[in-house]
Amino acid sequence: LPAVIPSDWVVTPSTVTHVHVKIVGQQEFLLPTHREFEVKAAGQLPTGFDPGTLYPSRNHPRGLQMSVYAASDALGSIGLDWETVRRHVAIDQMSVYAGSAMGQLDGAGTGGMLKARYLGQRVSAKFCPLGFAEMPADFVNAYVLGSLGGTGASLGACASFLYNLRLGIEDIRQGRARVVFVGAAEAPVTPEIMEGYAAMGALA
């Protein structure tokens, strides 16, 4: 039963676990339905791979989990020992530029904030901040690098990575940073967002 019983409902208990509801007048109902979705393909992580299990993810949105995992993997693949780099570069000489053009739209971010109430759930105080588009940079900084240099994102759909790369290059050229971490992360494969992509004809 809803938390607030409509005024045109008459609710009578019938058993310990069941009630009888009599509705006076017309009533609208939302019923589940099914249809074949136009989009048949989308890039996803391999089945069974959950980056959130590899660090204390605390219900982080999927895109942020991917960011932390990818950043950690990248540091292990640069050909240099990261601790050696840290000993030679001050923490305020490291910059991070990474973002998500779509933002964090799954149930742990903005998506959860937008639909929690109509699903009868509570809106968490984490939904809004974790949905911000620059959060990949903030999370790489906080969870992986711990730097005190420039942190942020430049957004531009498919060109987001290139825009962030430009910011990193400028930091090095201007002497603001000696090490720059650049990237982008998107995790928009949710039913609502896929509807938008389908309408655009962006996916096959």
For the regions a protein language model found, what residue spans apply to each?
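Conserved active-site "lid/cap" helical segment
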Residues: 1-98, 105
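Conserved catalytic cysteine-centered active-site region
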Residues: 23-65, 104-167, 198-204
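Non-transmembrane alpha-helical segments in soluble domains
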Residues: 72-75, 141, 169
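Secondary-structure boundary elements
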Residues: 76-84, 146-147, 170-180
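Beta-strand segments within the central parallel beta-sheet cores of soluble alpha/beta enzyme folds
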Residues: 85-96, 150-156, 180-185
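Acidic, glycine-rich active-site loops and adjacent beta-strand->loop/helix elements
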Residues: 100-103, 156-160, 184-189
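Acyl-CoA/ACP chain-elongation machinery
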Residues: 176-204
